[in-house]
């Protein structure tokens, strides 16, 4: 594994254990430069192609999904373990659909539904990008539809 600090490939594994949900192996690594970092090893069940709105296709990228979810969760009271479980559940649910091609709309909807239960603010943040909110009224209309806010 190449160190992200010094870019050398001289690292050793100092700790290895399965993640709590059992879907990956978490490894703590130590580089000769002294840097420590974590890597994850996951099983890829099948190759999934994402069909974009314009019809273009690209391979499903778990890291891209993860980044978009972490952006929505930024500065929210959700710990990394909870976020990783959510990302793993979402990835697994996509694989369990059993389809070789999945629309970006299906993925976005699945993430939104999960975030709705996990953190309402992250849900609105994700929706604002996914649904391409342009003006303040777009946010207001969306939030007005949320049951979470209507109950208050």
From Swiss-Prot:
InterPro entries in alphabetical order: ATP-cone_dom, NrdR-like_N, RNR_NrdR-like
Pfam family, one: Zn_ribbon_NrdR
Entry note: cofactor: Binds 1 zinc ion.
Transmembrane segments: none
Residue stretches making up the ATP-cone domain: 48-138
GO molecular function, one term: zinc ion binding
Swiss-Prot/TrEMBL keywords: ATP-binding, DNA-binding, Metal-binding, Nucleotide-binding, Repressor, Transcription, Transcription regulation, Zinc, Zinc-finger
Cofactors demanded by this protein: Zn(2+)
Zinc finger (unnamed): 3-33
Gene Ontology BP term (one): negative regulation of DNA-templated transcription
Free-text function comment from the UniProt entry: Negatively regulates transcription of bacterial ribonucleotide reductase nrd genes and operons by binding to NrdR-boxes.
Family: Belongs to the NrdR family.
Name used for this protein in its record: Transcriptional repressor NrdR
Originating species: Pelagibacter ubique (strain HTCC1062)
Upper classification of the organism: Bacteria, Pseudomonadati, Pseudomonadota, Alphaproteobacteria, Candidatus Pelagibacterales
């Amino acid at each position: 594994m190449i160190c992200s600090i010094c870019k050398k490939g001289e690292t050793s594994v100092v700790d290895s254990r399965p993640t709590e949900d059992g879907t990956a192996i978490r490894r703590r690594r130590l580089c000769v430069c002294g840097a420590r970092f974590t890597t994850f090893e996951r099983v890829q069940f099948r190759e999934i192609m994402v069909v974009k709105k314009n019809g273009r296709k690209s391979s499903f990228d778990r890291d891209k999904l993860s980044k978009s979810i972490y952006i929505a969760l930024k500065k929210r009271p959700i710990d990394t373990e909870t976020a990783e479980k959510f990302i793993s559940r979402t990835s697994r649910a996509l694989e369990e659909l059993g389809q070789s091609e999945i629309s970006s709309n299906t993925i976005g909807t699945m993430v939104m539904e999960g975030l709705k239960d996990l953190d309402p603010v992250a849900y609105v943040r994700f929706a604002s990008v996914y649904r391409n909110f342009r003006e303040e009224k777009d946010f207001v209309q969306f939030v007005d539809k949320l049951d979470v806010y209507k109950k208050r």
